[in-house]
């Protein structure tokens, strides 16, 4: 196995602070794992090695570009193959022509020249070494990894004994390890000497050695030729061999790309199957785990009822609508499963099945009545979200059925082989409706029939997994009891676990308990055997088994679970770490002392519960779910297991039964507690994900910005402008003008747009005229403004004032009186959440390579105004980076992505996609994956086929291959997507059908044409004449041509609907309404108007602050910008302007303000008033105010907050502060801050990597702490010992770190210690072997790499977040080897691995390889 491949790996390291050791830098030596992983061995065939080299070269060429200069690459590879074959053929010929010793002796006797040649061999070697010296000198560290040529030479020409040993699997791992001794030189030269010359030269050399002179040579050439006459035949033979070899060794994509790369590009075999199978792509992906599961009719009916009951728990539906609701759910399920229709199709074209319509007689109408004397009362039963829920529930039910089938199969085996007949399994298996209940049954079967199941596995020859072996080992005690005499005492308890559970469930008739004739202790004597040698052991064993039977009873678990959900409560307890870390300004303080939260309360605040669990993960709190009044519940269960008899014996047995029940309930409480806690988490995650979906739907549900005088849906021309994070008037204002078709026609920069004052002879800014000229020339419909700081508000005001004073107007339009008018140009602040992601993206660089990031940002702002839907759809998986709801980051990303995707699917299918526009416009093509029936694979395939068919779709049926060369999809997918792909109607095109430009599905075209004919009052003869002449679309075309669309309003749709239901059994009432609307206005814009941002939204967008992070009453840090005698001006970190009025400057009026404060000083202030519109806040610097921040309002009922614990903790913290109280140390250094470790981390959180804070140390006056940012979220705390101090408050003249490093002052320490380590961290993280992500992610990468390259090894570095200042070196020596990791410590001089220092990454990598090789050698 080639360990050379470790050069192909990557890696990372992270660190995390230990609270008790925050100011110490301790050595961390990770354990070196030396598991004996299986190594792949090399095949000792030079031919195979050469062919592998070819494969690797081909793979590398394709990886580096998909295909780059393919023809040249192929020619080069072919040339290399020819050269190698030529060498191999020459070698075989030499081997055939080898002379044995007798032949050589004979020749030597006849020709003394051979003896002399042999005698000078050693001299020849020395000469060869001499002419190689200059090349040897040039080979340095750069050639460590470039040993391919040397290896190839060795492989081609070296004798087998000179090659690497068969079992030296790590040889290639070392690529060149410091072997520069004479022996290596000699071996390399020997190999070169062994290399033969070219054919022609070889012949001449032989004759020359034989002593022939020039004349003799000429005669020989004349007689025999120069040896190259038949070279053409040899070359033809080589070409044929090459062609055969290419056919045999055809490279598939899987031979070139890693599986992860193929999956990312959707090029796997599975992707191809999804692409071509005639089934909606989303259905295929979702049902992939259950592809082979086929539901019976009975199971299908069961599923419909199961889903309806689940949904009824959360929907408020009138009792009389419950049955219609269940029927509606069943019908939707049929559409989803049997017909394979996606949710948007069902919602759009099967609406009638989601509406319950009843006829209500008109008041006062005669009873005998005319049937027309009634009105229709329609109740909507299901909405779009409900349909997606049904789709999800269908998947859950399939998982349920699959697990049930597995258990049933196990039980069937028990029945057939051991005649098992267990009513518990039979009853519970058929009635189980949740995964938990099925798991209960499975646990029961494996407990009750453990030995039989083991026998079945042995009979079947199945190897039990680790889990099964653990179960068998854990239950061997209970099996001994069950199979021994002691089980008789279990029976003597007088009631089975199942009968007791039946009593507790209040199911059926009560089961009565029988008492034996002896007391438990006395009866136990009769069951003594070899396993249990005395009565107490027997009784103890019997009680344990009976308790375990109760624990394993599915019915008993159901009792406890139901009671738990009814009586569950959540408590939150702070930990020792959380005591100090969570102060009153901390976001977790909201639940630091939260108690007695009912599960119903949690359901109303799902985000709160998820944050509690997050805080628990961080070790700050402990979240406990408990059973309220559990003792009362226990007392209620006692009568269900006790006997009703009155005697001493009965009392003794009842006491024993209660003891058993107590044992069982303790286990059950712990077991159910874990599942309840996890279930609540899942429900809360689902709830938050759905809230995000709802918020995303609202952002998607907005049409393009509507220009004045235009209809909704018209795309505007936009001029977008931004200063980014710059300051208006100082930094350039970037702008981009985007046409309505999305083309960026112009872009540039303005600097000075200030408005002059004629009265004061102040001219306009130098760029005002250029802006006016641009606006008059391009006539945009709107100016969009955004940015990343409050300065954007100033730009907005400046442009608004400019438009007003210069009377700048938008494009003209015709009003109701047919007069051309124009309105003042509107300036709007645009939501920039998509633009922020776009500006630095690869997509932006590809779209506009010459633009800068801020121009990209402006382009995205303009396109957002033109179509928010397209911009959101273009993000793909990056959509999860946008914040929709609080707590969103606590939801599993895949779950969130799935919910957001459904919102996109809903909106894309509401709007529809112009298929021909999608072919030419990438932004529109981004919508195709969300079209009903399609997905990313089918959408790409659709575009490919359309382009193959000429690049234009003339009508919808062409997608099926009708009148087209290739079909783009199958019938089922076409049925799903046809009505959502529209074709712009052109009256001149004879193939165009006007209905292809509507939301009407092709299955309803005949109905639409009939309605159009009736609206035009055409009889059958007129219809026939029109269609014969102009085709089937002629009637609708005539309706549009005559502008008679309004006539369809005169049609009575009820009669149409009744006829369709009566004659064709089709419910189409809602569909008819859709057809009527589409005939009047095809693909009408149904989205809401473009939503302008509210004041709060603008404030949050430009500052990043929300009501939770910045509000009145909070204490925040401010930076002083200007000091006067009566006020102070400052700024918050977020850019909001700060004003400190005179009354709030200080409590010390005897000291001048300028003496108290200095410019650029940062100090805490309490927010008194916040003006979000003008980005201004008033604050107080008075100590009285700052020391008493307004507590956050807590909306808790009595008993839900532990005030006593809160007061106790506050008092304890004050005591600790006072007992350890000393004068706060202040050091005159720009990096000093009076912070603790938490505050230092929070301060450095937004800083750059390598930034530093010097702070007081908790270890005393002779210590300082230095905190520096290693990486995002990772901070190292360094303890600095001060020596040679003048006094307690001065900094020591000598500073020591870790006992190893000494510095003269703080600047010396910062530069030569912290900054030096930061450089080494940068060097590591920029190295090609570094992997972003966790250790698990790096392991995953190594597994993927070695799986794709099984003969290669790999290593990589990753950051170690648990040990700041450390990285992990992860490696895997081949596909079947074990994963290992070694810690790498960052030190000022470089890195430390296994206590060996290395100055840089190259030395570290080589050092690792040597260490690894030595370790392997030691093993052998």
Swiss-Prot record:
It is found in: Nucleus; Chromosome. Residues 125-134 have a biased composition (Basic residues). Keywords: Chromosome, Nucleus, SH2 domain, Transcription. Its main location: nucleus. Residues 11-29, 45-57, 67-76, 145-154 have a biased composition (Acidic residues). GO terms for biological process: cellular response to stress; G1/S transition of mitotic cell cycle; negative regulation of transcription by RNA polymerase II; nucleosome assembly; nucleosome organization; poly(A)+ mRNA export from nucleus; positive regulation of transcription elongation by RNA polymerase II; regulation of mRNA 3'-end processing. GO terms for cellular component: euchromatin; pericentric heterochromatin; transcription elongation factor complex. GO terms for molecular function: DNA binding; histone binding; nucleosome binding; transcription antitermination factor activity, DNA binding. Residues 1-104, 117-167, 1186-1208 are annotated as: Disordered. InterPro entries: HHH_9, NA-bd_OB-fold, RNaseH-like_sf, RuvA_2-like, SH2, SH2_dom_sf, Spt6-like_S1, Spt6_acidic_N_dom. Residues 1230-1330 form the SH2 domain. The keyword Nucleus applies. Belongs to the SPT6 family. Histone H3-H4 chaperone that plays a role in maintenance of chromatin structure during RNA polymerase II transcription elongation thereby repressing transcription initiation from cryptic promoters. Mediates the reassembly of nucleosomes onto the promoters of at least a selected set of genes during repression; the nucleosome reassembly is essential for transcriptional repression. Essential for viability. This is Transcription elongation factor spt6. The gene is spt6.
